[in-house]
Amino acid sequence: MQKKIFITVALCLSICTVKAQKIPDSLAQDFRNFLAKNFSMYRTVNLNWETKWAHNYTFTQDGNELEKGKRRDLHKISFSTMIPVLKLKKVSLYANVQYRSYQFDAIEKTHSATSAIFSQDGYDYFAGGLNGTYYINVFNKPLTLSASVIADGWDKGFGKVQGLLSAVMIFKHTKTTTFTAGIMGMTLFSSIPIMPIISYWHRFNNPNLSVDITMPSQFYMRYQLNSHRFSAGASMTSDNFYMKPNLKNVPDICYFSEATLNPEIVYEYIINKHFYLVARAGASMVMMAGLYSDTRKGIKVRNEEGQTEVEPLVKMKRNMVPFFNLGVSYSLFK
C-alpha cells in the first residue's frame, strides 16, 4: 500500500512538472534563507549540549512490568551539519551528517542494581545522507520537491537506510507572511505512509513580533529586538539510539526511541547574519517511547476507534521533566 501511494504521488507531480513555468530566480535563495533563520536543523552547522532532570521510568511488555528504575545525570551532546554539494537556481543537493552522544546513569529501583535495559552509561548514534530539492512553478505557485536518503548506525555497526519524500507548495511569500502546505512520506518507522505539512509565518503590525507555526511539529510566538530574539511555544523532537538490552523475548539489538513534546522558552543571540547562540529551557513530555527491533518494527494494535497503530515491543513511561539546552549554530545563508 505504501509503495502504491508513493508511485501515485510521483506520477501526479511528474505530470504537473511538464507544464511548469519558470520559478523566480530569487525564490530558491529566499526559501533557503527562511529555513535557516527559523529552523536550526537547516543551518550549516549545529552544536548543542542538553541536560534533563533525573526522573523515574517504567518499562512494560504486554501489560507486564519489566523494570522500574531511575535515570539521573542525563547529558546529550549533538552535532549536525548540512553541506551544500550543488546549489543552483532550481536545484540544490546537500550532504548531511548527525552525531549524538547520550550519557546517563540508570538504576533499577527494586534491587538498587544497574538497569538490565540501560546497561551502559553512554550511547552513540550516527546518521548521514543526501537531500535533493527541486524548485519549480505549478499553477503559478512555487513548488519544492525534495527527496532524502538517510543511513544510521552506532558505535557497534550499521543500522538502517530510510527514504523521505516531500512536496511543499508556497502559496504566499511576502515580507510579512509566508504560507506553505504539502505532504511528506517516509519509508520506515511510521504507521502513516503520508502526512500533511503546513507552515505559517506572519509578522504583525509590531515589526518585532511574529508567529511561526509548522504543523505538526512546532508552534512559536517570536519577539526580536535588534540582535536578541525571544520565542515561546512548543516543538516535537525525539531521542534515538541502538542498544543491547538484557531482556528476554526481544531482539539482541534494539532501537530505543523517545518522542517528546517540549513546551519551551528560547533565547537566541544573533551574532551576525551567519552565527547564532541559542539557549532553551522547558519541559519534556513523552508522547511515545520504548524499544523497537533494529528494523524499526513494532507491534500492530487497534485503538479504541478501531484504527491500526504501531506500538513499541517494550513500552516506556516516565515523568515530565525540565530540560536545558545550550547551542551554537552557523548558517551559510543570510
Residue ranges of predicted features:
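Outer-membrane beta-barrel translocator/channel fold
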Residues: A54-G63, K68, T110, T214-K297, ...
